[in-house]
């Protein structure tokens, strides 16, 4: 991917594994997060280094040769991939139809169906990637993944898919379905807490009853649910922390004390972020089921921070819900309101949390305090040093976007050769594009995408431009050069 880095050593090791095991079709590495300066990004980076190794080892233990492909930082055996992993266009409309958005899980399942294994090289170092710099950027990516994972339900009964990958398809859906289930659970629990106060228990529902019917409460079940939930959430973090200390690697995280404090703070932030993600995931799932389409556009990779305006636009509903929900519970059932306070506080603070954790200044503050440090910051590898030098160079000049494919013969020919479909010739769009050379705003996004996905229209547009009278073409070409 554009945000991926792999060392030469891990490429050589993975290639050797592929050569020694001809039945391995895909070998996936376990990338560590790098390059983030925002507080949110630094928290995610820290988590991948502390919890990532034990998580990846656990995945490899259970999946063995039925692992997942994550779409990047992997080595693929090309011939079986080309022969067996072509993605179908699903019939019908999104979310269950159309082009498959989350392609990697499907390609791994198709590779296994063809008899080749998919493995996770969890114990090899030297694989890196950038994570989203802000909470909203991560949620934007999650929305695309949500629709893509829903499409996997169409492939669940596909002939030849092994049970392990059928389960992974369901698990991918439950990543977002669990958020909706959690919301329903706390909503129904809140409703029950209100009814317990508003409705007096009836001890004798029938006349002339000899014995009363007492309200039943099962504290053992509640305690058991609380313990199981706590273990599932926090035991992996404790095991990851123990593993770092046991291997005497705490110095690479700023020392044992700073490491433990960072884990505690990461846990606190996770508790605050989880309800916000729950609300967004619930909305994503419902919107996808209602047929709202999403695309796969470019991702924001820079640590520029989030504006208060954008945060307010996306989080105001969470804040209002948190205030309204909390006020009702506090008035009617204060004890339950206190019990639910971690979730309600997260809703109320969602705007502030999203903005503050997106700021590089907040990330640098924690870095100066020695918190959320990672081994690549304490002892950077040669690849990270080279990457830092390259990123320190002035950026390349920006080029005009889609118009480059209109004018430039080389770009036009290359772009058309890379398109796998012929595309439809739409005269009205082509005519509008010819008039849009002078005004980029004249073309809508859908029209631009139609042009860029149609080799026939790109050829006709390019041909018309180059066959136009010399004076007109020179004028247009001069204007084009001024854009560079």
Predicted regions and their residues:
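Short acidic (Asp/Glu) and glycine-rich catalytic loops that position anionic groups and cofactors
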Residues: 86-90, 119-124, 219, 301-302, ...
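C-terminal amphipathic alpha-helical interaction region
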Residues: 300, 308-484
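Basic/Trp-rich segment in TM-proximal cytosolic loops or flexible interdomain/linker regions
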Residues: 64, 131-135, 141-337
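Short, Lys/Arg-enriched, Gly/Pro-containing loop segments at transmembrane-helix junctions
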Residues: 13, 250-254, 294-297, 362-370
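Internal catalytic domains of large membrane-associated glycosyltransferases
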Residues: 1-160
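Generic structural hydrophobic/aromatic packing signal, biased to beta-strands
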Residues: 27-29, 43, 76, 111, ...
């Amino acid at each position: 991917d554009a945000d991926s880095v792999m060392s030469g050593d891990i490429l050589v090791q993975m290639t050797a594994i592929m050569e020694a095991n001809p039945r391995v079709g895909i070998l996936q590495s376990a990338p560590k997060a790098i390059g983030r300066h925002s507080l949110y990004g630094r928290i995610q980076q820290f988590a991948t280094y502390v919890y990532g190794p034990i998580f990846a080892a656990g995945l490899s233990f259970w999946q063995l040769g039925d692992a997942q492909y994550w779409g990047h930082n992997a080595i693929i055996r090309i011939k079986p991939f080309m022969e067996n992993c072509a993605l179908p266009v699903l019939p019908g409309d999104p979310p269950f139809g159309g082009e498959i958005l989350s392609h990697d899980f499907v390609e791994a399942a198709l590779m296994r169906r063809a008899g080749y294994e998919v493995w996770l090289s969890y114990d090899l170092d030297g694989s890196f990637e950038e994570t989203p710099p802000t909470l909203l950027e991560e949620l934007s990516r999650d929305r695309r993944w949500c629709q893509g994972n829903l499409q996997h339900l169409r492939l669940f009964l596909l002939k030849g898919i092994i049970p392990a990958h059928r389960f992974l398809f369901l698990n991918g859906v439950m990543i977002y379905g669990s958020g909706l289930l959690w919301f329903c659970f706390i909503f129904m629990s809140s409703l029950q807490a209100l009814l317990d106060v508003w409705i007096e228990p009836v001890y004798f529902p029938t006349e002339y009853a000899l014995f009363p019917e007492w309200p039943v409460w099962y504290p053992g079940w509640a305690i058991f649910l609380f313990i199981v939930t706590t273990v599932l959430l926090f035991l992996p973090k404790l095991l990851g922390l123990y593993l770092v200390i046991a291997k005497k690697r705490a110095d690479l995280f700023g020392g044992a004390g700073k490491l433990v404090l960072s884990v505690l703070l990461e846990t606190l932030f996770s508790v605050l972020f989880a309800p916000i993600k729950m609300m967004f995931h619930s909305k994503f799932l419902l919107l996808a089921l209602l047929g709202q389409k999403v695309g796969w556009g470019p991702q924001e990779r820079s640590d520029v921070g989030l504006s208060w305006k954008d945060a307010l636009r996306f989080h105001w509903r969470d804040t209002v819900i948190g205030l309204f929900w909390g006020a009702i519970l506090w008035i009617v059932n204060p004890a339950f309101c206190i019990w639910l306070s971690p979730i309600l506080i997260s809703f109320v603070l969602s705007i502030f949390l999203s903005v503050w954790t997106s700021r590089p200044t907040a990330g640098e503050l924690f870095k100066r305090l020695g918190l959320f440090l990672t081994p690549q910051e304490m002892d950077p590898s040669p690849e990270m040093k080279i990457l830092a030098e390259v990123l320190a160079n002035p950026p390349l000049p920006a080029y005009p976007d889609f118009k480059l494919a209109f004018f430039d013969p080389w770009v036009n020919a290359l772009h058309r050769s890379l398109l796998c479909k012929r595309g439809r010739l739409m005269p009205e769009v082509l005519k509008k594009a010819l008039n849009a050379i002078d005004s980029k705003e004249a073309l809508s996004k859908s029209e631009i995408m139609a042009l860029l996905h149609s080799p026939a229209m790109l050829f006709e547009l390019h041909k018309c431009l180059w066959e136009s009278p010399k004076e007109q073409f020179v004028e247009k070409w001069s204007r084009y050069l001024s854009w560079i």
